[in-house]
Protein backbone atom coordinates (compact mmCIF):
# COMPACT_ATOMS: atom_id res chain seq x y z
CA UNK A 1 0.00 0.00 0.00
CA UNK A 2 1.33 3.41 -0.92
CA UNK A 3 0.48 6.46 1.22
CA UNK A 4 0.35 9.68 -0.73
CA UNK A 5 0.90 12.74 1.47
CA UNK A 6 -0.53 16.06 0.53
CA UNK A 7 -0.82 19.29 2.48
CA UNK A 8 -4.28 18.22 3.59
CA UNK A 9 -3.41 14.75 4.93
CA UNK A 10 -3.22 13.99 8.64
CA UNK A 11 0.23 12.37 8.36
CA UNK A 12 1.65 15.46 6.70
CA UNK A 13 0.28 17.68 9.45
CA UNK A 14 1.77 15.42 12.15
CA UNK A 15 5.22 15.45 10.53
CA UNK A 16 5.19 19.23 10.19
CA UNK A 17 4.15 19.59 13.83
CA UNK A 18 6.99 17.32 14.98
CA UNK A 19 9.54 19.20 12.90
CA UNK A 20 8.35 22.54 14.28
CA UNK A 21 8.54 21.22 17.82
CA UNK A 22 12.09 19.95 17.28
CA UNK A 23 13.10 23.28 15.78
CA UNK A 24 11.70 25.15 18.77
CA UNK A 25 13.46 22.81 21.20
CA UNK A 26 16.80 23.25 19.41
CA UNK A 27 16.37 27.02 19.35
CA UNK A 28 15.55 27.08 23.05
CA UNK A 29 18.55 24.87 23.83
CA UNK A 30 21.00 27.07 21.96
CA UNK A 31 19.44 30.20 23.46
CA UNK A 32 19.98 28.81 26.97
CA UNK A 33 23.58 27.84 26.17
CA UNK A 34 24.22 31.27 24.65
CA UNK A 35 22.79 33.11 27.65
CA UNK A 36 24.64 30.95 30.16
CA UNK A 37 27.93 31.43 28.34
CA UNK A 38 27.71 35.18 28.07
CA UNK A 39 26.37 35.55 31.59
CA UNK A 40 29.48 33.74 32.75
CA UNK A 41 31.92 35.68 30.56
CA UNK A 42 30.26 38.77 29.08
CA UNK A 43 33.29 41.04 29.04
CA UNK A 44 36.34 39.03 28.01
CA UNK A 45 38.36 40.24 31.02
CA UNK A 46 40.13 37.93 33.46
CA UNK A 47 41.77 38.87 36.74
CA UNK A 48 43.82 36.15 38.46
CA UNK A 49 41.97 33.60 36.34
CA UNK A 50 38.52 34.88 37.34
CA UNK A 51 36.23 35.81 34.45
CA UNK A 52 34.71 39.21 35.09
CA UNK A 53 30.91 39.10 34.71
CA UNK A 54 27.79 40.87 35.87
CA UNK A 55 27.68 38.80 39.04
CA UNK A 56 31.16 39.73 40.30
CA UNK A 57 32.14 42.96 38.54
CA UNK A 58 31.63 45.11 41.65
CA UNK A 59 34.08 43.00 43.70
CA UNK A 60 35.98 40.61 41.46
CA UNK A 61 38.36 39.11 44.02
CA UNK A 62 36.09 39.42 47.03
CA UNK A 63 38.32 41.82 48.95
CA UNK A 64 37.12 45.13 47.51
CA UNK A 65 40.37 45.96 45.70
CA UNK A 66 39.41 45.17 42.09
CA UNK A 67 36.19 46.15 40.33
CA UNK A 68 34.94 46.82 36.81
CA UNK A 69 32.52 49.42 35.46
CA UNK A 70 30.83 48.21 32.31
CA UNK A 71 29.49 51.66 31.40
CA UNK A 72 32.91 53.31 31.02
CA UNK A 73 34.98 50.15 30.50
CA UNK A 74 37.26 50.82 33.47
CA UNK A 75 38.91 48.13 35.57
CA UNK A 76 39.96 49.72 38.86
CA UNK A 77 42.85 48.51 41.02
CA UNK A 78 42.49 50.06 44.47
CA UNK A 79 45.60 49.28 46.55
CA UNK A 80 45.50 45.78 45.11
CA UNK A 81 48.21 43.15 45.47
CA UNK A 82 47.49 40.17 43.22
CA UNK A 83 49.61 37.04 42.93
CA UNK A 84 48.67 34.44 40.36
CA UNK A 85 50.40 31.54 38.64
CA UNK A 86 49.29 32.52 35.13
CA UNK A 87 48.61 35.79 33.30
CA UNK A 88 47.48 38.10 36.08
CA UNK A 89 45.29 40.40 33.97
CA UNK A 90 44.10 39.25 30.55
CA UNK A 91 41.75 41.26 28.33
CA UNK A 92 40.28 40.29 24.98
CA UNK A 93 38.79 43.77 24.58
CA UNK A 94 39.95 47.38 24.68
CA UNK A 95 40.45 48.20 28.35
CA UNK A 96 41.20 51.08 30.71
CA UNK A 97 42.91 50.25 34.00
CA UNK A 98 42.51 52.90 36.69
CA UNK A 99 45.00 52.98 39.56
CA UNK A 100 44.19 54.11 43.08
CA UNK A 101 47.02 53.93 45.61
CA UNK A 102 49.91 51.47 45.24
CA UNK A 103 49.16 48.34 43.24
CA UNK A 104 51.20 45.24 42.46
CA UNK A 105 50.71 42.34 40.05
CA UNK A 106 52.92 39.29 40.56
CA UNK A 107 53.00 36.29 38.21
CA UNK A 108 54.47 33.34 40.09
CA UNK A 109 54.75 30.89 37.19
CA UNK A 110 58.15 29.19 37.19
CA UNK A 111 58.23 28.49 33.44
CA UNK A 112 56.44 31.25 31.51
CA UNK A 113 55.27 34.40 33.27
CA UNK A 114 53.25 37.38 32.09
CA UNK A 115 51.74 40.25 34.04
CA UNK A 116 49.24 41.92 31.70
CA UNK A 117 48.22 40.74 28.24
CA UNK A 118 45.75 42.61 26.04
CA UNK A 119 44.70 41.23 22.69
CA UNK A 120 42.67 38.58 20.92
CA UNK A 121 44.51 36.59 18.29
CA UNK A 122 45.48 39.02 15.51
CA UNK A 123 43.06 41.78 16.51
CA UNK A 124 44.67 44.93 17.86
CA UNK A 125 43.39 46.03 21.26
CA UNK A 126 43.98 49.25 23.17
CA UNK A 127 45.14 49.26 26.77
CA UNK A 128 45.29 52.43 28.85
CA UNK A 129 46.80 52.61 32.34
CA UNK A 130 45.75 55.76 34.18
CA UNK A 131 44.90 57.30 37.53
CA UNK A 132 46.60 58.94 40.49
CA UNK A 133 48.09 55.69 41.79
CA UNK A 134 50.95 53.48 40.65
CA UNK A 135 51.43 49.94 39.37
CA UNK A 136 54.31 47.50 39.76
CA UNK A 137 54.45 44.31 37.69
CA UNK A 138 56.83 41.58 38.83
CA UNK A 139 57.70 38.22 37.28
CA UNK A 140 60.03 36.83 39.97
CA UNK A 141 60.20 33.10 39.27
CA UNK A 142 59.95 32.43 35.53
CA UNK A 143 63.05 30.75 34.12
CA UNK A 144 61.86 29.93 30.59
CA UNK A 145 60.20 33.06 29.20
CA UNK A 146 58.76 36.22 30.71
CA UNK A 147 56.87 39.34 29.62
CA UNK A 148 55.81 42.06 31.98
CA UNK A 149 53.19 43.75 29.81
CA UNK A 150 52.05 43.08 26.25
CA UNK A 151 49.49 45.18 24.38
CA UNK A 152 49.22 46.20 20.71
CA UNK A 153 48.41 49.83 21.52
CA UNK A 154 49.47 51.02 24.97
CA UNK A 155 48.83 54.35 26.69
CA UNK A 156 50.53 54.92 30.05
CA UNK A 157 49.21 57.86 32.06
CA UNK A 158 50.32 56.74 35.54
CA UNK A 159 53.57 55.61 37.13
CA UNK A 160 54.45 52.09 36.00
CA UNK A 161 57.29 49.77 37.03
CA UNK A 162 58.03 46.44 35.32
CA UNK A 163 60.54 43.95 36.74
CA UNK A 164 61.37 40.76 34.84
CA UNK A 165 63.80 37.95 35.72
CA UNK A 166 66.75 36.32 34.01
CA UNK A 167 65.38 33.60 31.71
CA UNK A 168 66.78 30.70 29.73
CA UNK A 169 65.01 31.67 26.49
CA UNK A 170 63.69 35.23 26.37
CA UNK A 171 62.47 38.02 28.60
CA UNK A 172 60.59 41.19 27.68
CA UNK A 173 59.59 44.13 29.84
CA UNK A 174 57.01 45.93 27.67
CA UNK A 175 55.91 44.81 24.20
CA UNK A 176 53.69 46.95 21.93
CA UNK A 177 52.79 45.51 18.54
CA UNK A 178 51.54 48.87 17.26
CA UNK A 179 52.20 51.96 19.38
CA UNK A 180 53.25 53.34 22.75
CA UNK A 181 52.19 56.65 24.29
CA UNK A 182 53.41 57.91 27.67
CA UNK A 183 51.43 60.93 28.89
CA UNK A 184 50.34 62.86 31.99
CA UNK A 185 53.90 63.27 33.33
CA UNK A 186 54.04 59.53 34.00
CA UNK A 187 57.28 57.71 34.83
CA UNK A 188 57.83 54.27 33.31
CA UNK A 189 60.64 52.15 34.75
CA UNK A 190 61.67 48.79 33.29
CA UNK A 191 64.27 46.53 34.89
CA UNK A 192 64.63 43.68 32.42
CA UNK A 193 66.38 40.38 33.00
CA UNK A 194 69.02 38.67 30.89
CA UNK A 195 68.36 35.77 28.53
CA UNK A 196 70.26 33.31 26.35
CA UNK A 197 68.22 34.11 23.22
CA UNK A 198 66.45 37.45 23.53
CA UNK A 199 66.22 40.23 26.10
CA UNK A 200 64.31 43.45 25.40
CA UNK A 201 63.28 46.09 27.92
CA UNK A 202 60.83 48.04 25.72
CA UNK A 203 59.87 46.98 22.20
CA UNK A 204 57.49 49.03 20.01
CA UNK A 205 56.70 47.81 16.51
CA UNK A 206 55.22 51.16 15.49
CA UNK A 207 55.62 54.73 16.75
CA UNK A 208 56.47 55.82 20.30
CA UNK A 209 55.41 59.18 21.73
CA UNK A 210 56.46 60.71 25.05
CA UNK A 211 54.39 63.70 26.09
CA UNK A 212 55.84 66.73 27.86
CA UNK A 213 57.28 65.95 31.29
CA UNK A 214 57.21 62.16 30.98
CA UNK A 215 60.06 59.76 31.80
CA UNK A 216 61.25 56.37 30.61
CA UNK A 217 64.00 54.48 32.43
CA UNK A 218 64.90 51.13 30.87
CA UNK A 219 67.71 48.78 31.88
CA UNK A 220 68.81 45.21 31.17
CA UNK A 221 70.69 42.89 33.49
CA UNK A 222 74.15 41.55 32.57
CA UNK A 223 74.52 38.07 31.17
CA UNK A 224 72.54 38.01 27.92
CA UNK A 225 74.28 35.85 25.32
CA UNK A 226 71.76 36.39 22.52
CA UNK A 227 70.05 39.58 21.38
CA UNK A 228 70.10 42.33 24.01
CA UNK A 229 67.88 45.40 23.52
CA UNK A 230 66.97 48.43 25.59
CA UNK A 231 64.42 50.52 23.64
CA UNK A 232 63.49 49.45 20.12
CA UNK A 233 61.09 51.54 18.03
CA UNK A 234 60.24 50.26 14.55
CA UNK A 235 58.63 53.56 13.56
CA UNK A 236 59.29 57.12 14.74
CA UNK A 237 60.25 58.22 18.25
CA UNK A 238 58.85 61.58 19.37
CA UNK A 239 59.87 63.20 22.65
CA UNK A 240 57.95 66.24 23.84
CA UNK A 241 59.30 69.15 25.85
CA UNK A 242 61.21 68.38 29.07
CA UNK A 243 61.01 64.61 28.73
CA UNK A 244 63.60 62.18 30.08
CA UNK A 245 64.84 59.04 28.37
CA UNK A 246 67.41 56.94 30.20
CA UNK A 247 68.35 53.59 28.65
CA UNK A 248 71.22 51.27 29.53
CA UNK A 249 72.04 47.73 28.42
CA UNK A 250 74.73 45.39 29.67
CA UNK A 251 75.70 43.65 26.44
CA UNK A 252 79.19 42.68 27.56
CA UNK A 253 78.58 38.99 26.80
CA UNK A 254 77.05 39.43 23.33
CA UNK A 255 77.76 41.26 20.08
CA UNK A 256 74.04 41.56 19.28
CA UNK A 257 73.18 44.57 21.39
CA UNK A 258 70.90 47.53 20.64
CA UNK A 259 70.54 50.13 23.36
CA UNK A 260 68.26 52.62 21.60
CA UNK A 261 67.27 51.64 18.07
CA UNK A 262 64.88 53.76 16.00
CA UNK A 263 63.93 52.78 12.46
CA UNK A 264 62.46 56.16 11.57
CA UNK A 265 62.84 59.70 12.89
CA UNK A 266 64.12 60.35 16.41
CA UNK A 267 63.02 63.79 17.59
CA UNK A 268 64.24 65.10 20.95
CA UNK A 269 62.07 67.88 22.34
CA UNK A 270 63.09 71.24 23.81
CA UNK A 271 64.76 70.83 27.18
CA UNK A 272 64.64 67.04 27.05
CA UNK A 273 67.35 64.69 28.26
CA UNK A 274 68.49 61.47 26.59
CA UNK A 275 71.08 59.22 28.22
CA UNK A 276 72.11 55.97 26.54
CA UNK A 277 74.91 53.55 27.39
CA UNK A 278 76.08 50.20 26.06
CA UNK A 279 79.23 48.11 26.17
CA UNK A 280 79.68 46.59 22.70
CA UNK A 281 76.90 48.14 20.61
CA UNK A 282 76.40 51.73 19.58
CA UNK A 283 74.41 53.43 22.32
CA UNK A 284 72.01 54.91 19.74
CA UNK A 285 71.23 53.56 16.28
CA UNK A 286 68.84 55.57 14.10
CA UNK A 287 67.98 54.62 10.54
CA UNK A 288 66.15 57.86 9.83
CA UNK A 289 67.35 61.19 11.17
CA UNK A 290 68.05 62.50 14.67
CA UNK A 291 66.78 65.97 15.51
CA UNK A 292 67.84 67.47 18.85
CA UNK A 293 66.03 70.67 19.73
CA UNK A 294 66.97 73.73 21.78
CA UNK A 295 68.26 73.19 25.33
CA UNK A 296 68.07 69.41 25.01
CA UNK A 297 70.91 67.20 26.23
CA UNK A 298 71.92 64.06 24.35
CA UNK A 299 74.55 61.86 26.00
CA UNK A 300 75.54 58.51 24.52
CA UNK A 301 78.39 56.20 25.45
CA UNK A 302 79.60 52.88 24.07
CA UNK A 303 82.56 51.29 25.84
CA UNK A 304 83.85 49.20 22.95
CA UNK A 305 82.35 50.77 19.83
CA UNK A 306 83.98 53.56 17.85
CA UNK A 307 80.64 55.34 17.43
CA UNK A 308 78.38 56.17 20.35
CA UNK A 309 75.68 57.24 17.89
CA UNK A 310 75.19 55.71 14.44
CA UNK A 311 72.72 57.40 12.10
CA UNK A 312 71.85 56.44 8.52
CA UNK A 313 70.47 59.91 7.93
CA UNK A 314 71.59 63.22 9.37
CA UNK A 315 71.99 64.37 12.96
CA UNK A 316 70.45 67.84 13.10
CA UNK A 317 71.33 69.96 16.12
CA UNK A 318 68.99 72.89 16.81
CA UNK A 319 70.91 74.18 19.81
CA UNK A 320 71.17 71.04 21.93
CA UNK A 321 74.16 69.77 23.89
CA UNK A 322 75.43 66.52 22.39
CA UNK A 323 78.01 64.44 24.24
CA UNK A 324 78.88 61.54 21.95
CA UNK A 325 81.03 60.30 19.09
CA UNK A 326 78.78 60.40 16.02
CA UNK A 327 78.89 58.39 12.80
CA UNK A 328 76.18 59.92 10.61
CA UNK A 329 75.99 59.03 6.92
CA UNK A 330 73.95 62.18 6.31
CA UNK A 331 76.38 64.30 8.31
CA UNK A 332 76.01 66.45 11.42
CA UNK A 333 74.20 69.72 10.82
CA UNK A 334 74.36 72.44 13.46
CA UNK A 335 71.48 74.89 13.19
CA UNK A 336 71.74 77.12 16.22
Model-derived regions, located:
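A composition-driven surface/loop motif
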Residues: 14, 30-336
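Short, Lys/Arg-enriched N-terminal segments with co-localized hydrophobic residues
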Residues: 1-4
Amino acid sequence: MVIIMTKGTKVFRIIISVLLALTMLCSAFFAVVFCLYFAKDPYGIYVAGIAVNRDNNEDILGDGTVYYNENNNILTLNNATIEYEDTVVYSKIDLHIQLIGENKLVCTNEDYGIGIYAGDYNLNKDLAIMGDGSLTIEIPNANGEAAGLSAPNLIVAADLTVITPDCEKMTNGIVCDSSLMVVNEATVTVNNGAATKYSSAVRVRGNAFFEEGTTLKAFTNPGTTGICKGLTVSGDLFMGKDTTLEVSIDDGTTDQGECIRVSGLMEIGIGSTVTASAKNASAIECFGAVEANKSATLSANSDNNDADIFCSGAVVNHGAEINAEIDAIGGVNNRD
